[in-house]
């Protein structure tokens, strides 16, 4: 892509000729500014110069943008010299990548990446820190983890020819012990992720709630009883009455206020602001975002964000355009090159494998086929084609607003052998049309109209 000077073509947000005394949050990029956004980057080896058919076309898309974003959902270190350990709390698998991944991602075109997710501390603080070191040395800006909450929640800045870009990254899906905190009194800070805590409630019909109340009251030591006839707590789960049975979420007010302030702060120091959130809620099975997410995305844009990029469920969810800003509720998987090794002793145990008999690859295959363990059994298997289909989203901005969004359907080699699948290529026409028609259906409830030209989705404003 042709790069223009930082001043040429700029539609500057002037304060009516007045001096900026408050710290403006207006967007201020050169016309033609482009952002590429993709979903989860789960990659274990170098690929930029590899033999994977069709991947070079994807790299061309990544390299052509001013800013290219992905969710960094792995840790990078050399296991031979690593001084950390796999944690008892982990994100469902111990993701690990070779140190060469950092320079390789940079060579592909990635220059900015989110770090806050449920895998950020799979290998402890040591894994988090080593990944940060390698990304820093590779020249990739990253946000969402740090030595304190203040560091993890802060905007990180990328200089481009068309404007300065701020990135903020948070996770609503995270392992409890990975949440960062700031110092208080004599207690030091805790390293970890920028977490947005959610309170989940199960919505049930009134007669269901009464049945649950009877169960609660029959249990020994049921705990304090509330007179509220529309809510109760049973075995640590909150139940509420409502019209539609399902799940509802409420964001922690302190976390949300801190995040909104940091978005405002990040935008005051930049020309363009990306906010990214890792959200599996209500579950990987759902094509729709959880009920908190639309309000969250809109509040973030109101606070100064120019794009909201969601990821987590490993599948596509809908797209909304709000105030001429894109909201991607999930961009699914971009890489699912899950050749991780070592997988850790806990993974062998979970999938009833023997490290003296079975292999890391066989553990990974079992995990992807069976899913993750819960009290009710295994759930969340990722062995369906939908998890190997996504899009590369290319947003072009004119006059500081979204002018066009191009959606390039990709497929990740669902039917290939384990050693070869998980690397994206442009989807063949029939599959591309199917992916885009699904995205049309998922985006329609948000009032978004996607047209299909050849095998590319288009949103024009």
Curated annotation (Swiss-Prot):
A Pfam short name: PGA_cap
Keyword vocabulary terms for this entry: Plasmid
SMART domains referenced in this protein's UniProt entry, alphabetically: PGA_cap
Record flagged with keyword Ligase: no
InterPro entries: Capsule_synth_CapA, CW_Biosynth-Accessory, Metallo-depent_PP-like
Family note: Belongs to the CapA family.
Name of this chain's protein: Uncharacterized protein y4sH
Species per Swiss-Prot/TrEMBL record: Sinorhizobium fredii (strain NBRC 101917 / NGR234)
